[in-house]
């Protein structure tokens, strides 16, 4: 019973720490007309680069883990 209680407490602590991290990463958008669709191109550029880098990493990892067997 004691191990179960310690496990639950640890799980709750981990979940709470993850919630705090996600709150810290949240960024309020500046009020420069965003609600009217007036974003500058630089605001999209950083997200695109990040997404592209993540896709490249995932592609390389998948190719290493699951090699393709092509029949010729």
From Swiss-Prot:
Residues carrying Phenylalanine amide: 36
UniProt keyword list: Amidation, Cleavage on pair of basic residues, Neuropeptide, Secreted, Signal
Signal peptide range in chain numbering: 1-24
Secreted as UniProt keyword: yes
Primary site of residence: secreted
Propeptide residue interval(s): 40-72
Subcellular location: Secreted
GO cellular component, one term: extracellular region
Assigned protein family: Belongs to the FARP (FMRFamide related peptide) family.
Protein name, entry field: Neuropeptide IMFamide
């Amino acid at each position: 019973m004691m191990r179960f209680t310690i496990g639950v407490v640890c799980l709750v602590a981990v979940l709470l720490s993850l919630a705090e991290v996600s709150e810290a990463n949240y960024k309020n958008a500046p009020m420069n007309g965003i609600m009217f669709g007036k974003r500058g191109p630089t605001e999209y550029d950083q997200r695109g680069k990040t997404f592209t880098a993540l896709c490249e990493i995932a592609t390389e990892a998948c190719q290493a883990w699951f090699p393709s067997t092509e029949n010729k």
